[in-house]
Curated annotation (Swiss-Prot):
It comes from the Bacteria. One of its GO terms (cellular component) is ribosome. It comes from Caulobacter vibrioides (strain ATCC 19089 / CIP 103742 / CB 15). The gene is rplU. Residues 154-163 have a biased composition (Basic residues). InterPro entries: bL21-like, bL21-like_sf, Ribosomal_bL21. This protein binds to 23S rRNA in the presence of protein L20. Part of the 50S ribosomal subunit. Contacts protein L20. This is Large ribosomal subunit protein bL21. Residues 144-171 are annotated as: Disordered. It holds the Pfam family Ribosomal_L21p.
């Protein structure tokens, strides 16, 4: 069973178990996400098209991570003027695992397990360092710094020097 959903101004065709990269969604990793704007449901030859959405249909998922996407380069140029500017921008995106597609009295569920292992640990395992090296690589949560002691008074500015006098007798 598949569905066509709309989120972030874009449409996606999804099935249970799919990994979906969408515009940024609010929530922590592991949070449940529901997409209620289902435009179409399909199973084999049977297709249900909504007008504009299918009533009672919902696609559920789990938020895996929120990250920055690929960099988009912005290049401005005015020819023959020596004017060139390059900037870049990375949009936030969320990765969602679709866990179920439900509607029209039917439901398709994904039977897998969701692993929320941080990327740092996965990278260490891939390099063959094992889990023993991982705790040293994960940064500890930053606590608020203690308030600074009373700041020293600022120094006074040095007095300005008098302008040098010139002799007016020579012309």
């Amino acid at each position: 069973m598949y569905a066509v959903i709309k989120t972030g101004g874009k449409q996606y065709r999804v099935q249970a178990g799919d990994l979906l990269v969408v515009e940024k969604l609010e929530g922590e990793p592991g949070a449940a996400v529901a997409f209620g704007e289902v435009l179409m449901l399909g199973e084999g030859e049977a297709v249900t098209v909504g007008a504009p959405t299918v009533d009672g249909a919902v696609v559920s998922g789990t938020l895996l991570e929120t990250r920055k996407g690929e960099k988009v380069k912005i290049f401005k140029k005015i020819r023959r003027q020596g004017y060139r500017r390059t900037r870049g921008h990375r949009q936030f995106e969320s990765v969602v695992r679709v866990t179920s597609v439900a509607g029209a009295g039917k439901e398709a569920k994904w039977e897998g397990t969701i692993d929320l292992t941080p990327k740092v640990i996965l990278d260490a395992r891939a390099r063959g360092l094992g889990d023993a090296a991982v705790p040293a690589t994960i940064p500890a949560p930053v606590e608020a710094a203690p308030a600074k002691a009373e700041a020293a008074p600022k120094k006074k500015a040095a007095p300005k020097k008098a302008a040098a006098k010139t002799e007016e007798g020579e012309a």
